[in-house]
């Protein structure tokens, strides 16, 4: 788990969590990728220090940056869906993953503003603008890394999925 490794650059730390959410959904698919992230969130909620800055607990998830953590659930669902349904259409995957990122920014920033009472313009300057270029790189890396890994694991994942349905 790379979530704890973060760079505190302000109210919202830089972390690899968006990349890992994208990768989990890209490689494992919509259901399993989302479940993997939910397990991570639950582990963090009970206090295991898996969140940014080696932190955890309800205060982390319900605090100012918790909206982003919760919005990653939708990011995993959307990424997994588009990869499963439109695997050959990489441009569409990138667009849907970017839309998921925008939704994550919107939900997370709304939560942040509600928690901190910071003006929206300032919250955007602190919580969104510095992250857009890096998060777009993470999105691209998820596609570049996720495709070959998913293809190599395809038989294994299909066998596991069939076994879980039996």
What are these regions (language model features)?
Residues 1-34:
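Hydrophobic transmembrane alpha-helices
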Residues 27-31, 78-86, 149-153:
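Structural signal for the C-terminal ends of transmembrane alpha-helices
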Residues 58-106:
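Short helix-perturbing small/polar motifs within transmembrane alpha-helices
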Residues 87-161:
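Membrane-embedded alpha-helical hairpins and interfacial helices in multi-pass inner-membrane proteins
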